[in-house]
Amino acid sequence: MELKTFAFLQIAAFIALGVQIFFVGTDALGDEDQLFSVEYCGTNCTQQDDGKWTPCSGKNGKCKCYHEDGKRYGLCLYTEYTDFSQYPNPEGSEIENTRPRP
């Protein structure tokens, strides 16, 4: 009896977790106020014998080395996060002022 109750509770917990993950995932897909972009800088980076990583150049020094744990090589990537929710929506008069004048 106790085993059946425990199994039932486990199944209920997994179902609740699955529903939660589904709703969080679909909510994140509809979030258009945030943008996260990644660009390859055209170079790779390697770990030297002293443990330091070779520097990444490009994008005015904003490229960083990203690598997996235990690997001695990685990619130089430029990442940028933009939160558009911090900017107000333009109003009609602001849009009219941006039109080219004859």
Curated annotation (Swiss-Prot):
Cysteines engaged in disulfide bonds, as pairs: C41-C63, C45-C65, C56-C76
Function statement: Salivary chemokine-binding protein which binds to host chemokines CXCL1 and CXCL8.
Localization terms from the record: Secreted
Protein's UniProt keywords contain RNA-binding: no
Highest rank taxon of the organism: Eukaryota
A single Gene Ontology CC term: extracellular region
Organism expressing this protein natively: Ixodes ricinus (Common tick)
Known glycosylation sites: N44
Lineage: Eukaryota, Metazoa, Ecdysozoa, Arthropoda, Chelicerata
Name of the molecule in the record: Evasin P1170
GO molecular function: C-X-C chemokine binding
Claim: Flavoprotein is one of the keywords in the record: no
Keywords of the record: Disulfide bond, Glycoprotein, Secreted, Signal
